A protein has these predicted regions:
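Feature recognizes metal-dependent phosphohydrolase scaffolds
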Residues: 1-171
Length: 171
């Protein structure tokens, strides 16, 4: 508990870090539509059948664009809400975004950091990707995602950040 409190205090009282976070929250978002292009980091959480995964956030289900919007709203609440309960929900959502199976930013079924550092069994170190990565190269999936974000023209593009390419595995 002491370590967590020290880390929390360091984060809260680091002026440079707070300046960077405020800039990210002022200028950034979970996604951006610019010049007819949809930009996002990570994935659009999907099910095995290629449909958008529904995620329960505080008793309501969200998917696709609505999921991005609600997560973005809660991240901002974590920093700016005057209501302590909403700030706490926002902080919980930030943890969710970092580690959860249906997080658009994480995009994996589990986080295996501990396993990679401390265990020898390779099968335990695997972080299986969200089904999004199985479908994203299909034109019908790209069209479905673009429509979800209100982009309907043939000139629209998805610019997807952080899609690792594993050359040694033949990608």
């Amino acid at each position: 508990e002491e370590v967590i409190q020290r880390l929390r205090s360091s984060f809260i009282h680091c002026e440079k870090l707070q300046t960077h976070v405020k800039l990210l929250l002022k200028k950034g978002s979970m996604y951006k539509i610019y010049n007819g292009n949809l930009l996002f980091h990570g994935c659009i959480p999907m099910r095995k059948d290629g449909s958008f995964a529904k995620v329960n956030i505080y008793g309501r289900e969200y998917s696709g664009k609505a999921l991005f919007d609600i997560l973005d709203a809660y991240v901002r609440k974590a920093f700016f809400s005057g209501d302590e309960a909403e700030r706490e929900k926002g902080r919980d959502i930030m943890w969710y975004i970092w580690t959860a199976p249906y997080s658009p930013l994480y995009g994996r079924r589990k986080m295996a950091t501990f396993e990679r550092y401390f265990l020898e069994e390779e099968e335990l170190k695997t972080e299986k990707k969200n089904y999004y990565y199985d479908y994203i190269n299909k034109p019908e999936t790209a069209d479905m995602i673009l429509r979800e974000f209100g982009l309907h023209d043939n000139i629209n593009h998805i610019i997807n950040g952080h899609v690792p390419v594993h050359r040694l595995r033949g990608e």
